[in-house]
Design a protein with these regions (language model features):
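C-terminal helical cap(s) of enzyme catalytic domains, especially alpha/beta-barrels
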Residues: 220-236
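TerminUS-proximal long segments
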Residues: 252-264
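Long, low-complexity, intrinsically disordered extramembrane tails
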Residues: 239-244
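Alpha/beta enzyme core
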Residues: 1-210, 223, 263-291
């Protein structure tokens, strides 16, 4: 964070924004043990999340790494990969500490990576962060890595179960199944997904919502659908009806793909340099004029 701030100063960037992203909430390994000089300092707080076991000189092995923690000699659990393991269920606490530390040391916004889109979970962490940094602002990734349908259906299922509603017609682990699409549970889940951004901003203090990689998925899905139609019963109509016709009627500029690739710009330059002798790509007979 200090390096980024220094770069802003060197480059004369007066309105640069630093977003500090935590490790994923579900991440359970680390490659390092923090330096600590006294009990309770930042390094000591970080090390407190390590999965350790108390040892003595009798059960100490060659090459073991040991630290002093709370007056005891402990051995952090080290995997064959040489990574150290965090204690189970410390993810939220680690993200909270990471976020507070980042904000106190120059970050403008924090970005917490959760393992599911759950407003209550996000709000709980932000409440803890704001106890120390009241004006903390969160960037949240509405990630395609989440199974949004299953997650929200399970959240509705759990809520119905807690309130004593009849859930006998649902199987929690199978809620992604199409057979549930028209059920009240699925409709409630979709309503929650629809209002997720507004609800999360209001209830969990999310300052900015982003979504990573959506066009990767839309490109893959549309290409798959086109291939099925073009090489299936629809033939060329699969492209015309579901792509080109929609481009024209919805005013998508890419329908003139020659223009979007710069053909007009190229022709202008050719004409400027060669005049009437210019060999231009466009002209009255160019297919682009059909659009």
């Amino acid at each position: 964070i200090n390096a980024v701030r220094y770069a802003f100063l060197e480059l004369g960037v007066d309105d640069g924004i630093i977003v500090a992203r935590t490790d994923s909430l579900g991440a359970g390994l680390t490659k390092q043990i923090a330096i600590t000089n006294e009990e309770g300092d930042l390094g000591d707080q970080y090390n407190s999340f390590l999965d350790v076991e108390e040892i003595s000189s009798e059960n100490m092995n060659h090459g073991d790494v040991m630290i002093s923690q709370n007056g005891k000699v402990v051995r952090p659990k080290r995997l064959p990969s040489n990574l150290y393991q965090f204690r189970k269920d410390t993810g939220e606490a680690r993200c909270i500490l990471d976020s507070i530390t980042s904000l106190q040391n120059g970050a403008d916004l924090i970005w917490i990576e959760t393992e599911k889109p759950h407003i209550g979970q996000i709000a709980g962490m932000m409440d803890e962060i704001k106890k120390v940094v009241p004006n903390a602002k969160l960037v949240y990734n509405n990630s395609p890595s989440f199974n949004w349908t299953l997650s929200f259906r399970q959240q509705v299922f759990d809520s119905m179960s807690e309130s004593g509603e009849d859930i006998s017609s649902y199987e929690r682990d199978d809620l992604m199944n199409e057979k549930y699409d028209d059920t009240d549970l699925a409709k409630k889940a979709d309503d929650s997904i629809r209002s997720f951004q507004a609800d999360a901003s209001k209830e969990a203090g999310i300052f900015h919502h982003l979504i990573t990689l959506p066009t990767y998925h839309t490109a893959a899905l549309s290409t798959d659908n086109l291939a099925k139609e073009y090489f299936g019963s629809e033939g060329m109509l699969g492209y015309v009806a579901n792509v080109q016709r929609k481009e024209i009627r919805e005013g998508i500029a890419c329908v003139k793909h020659q223009n979007m690739s710069g053909s007009d710009m190229g022709d202008d330059h050719k004409e400027y340099f060669a005049g009437d002798a210019a060999l231009k790509a466009a002209g009255k007979d160019n297919t682009m004029n059909q659009f």
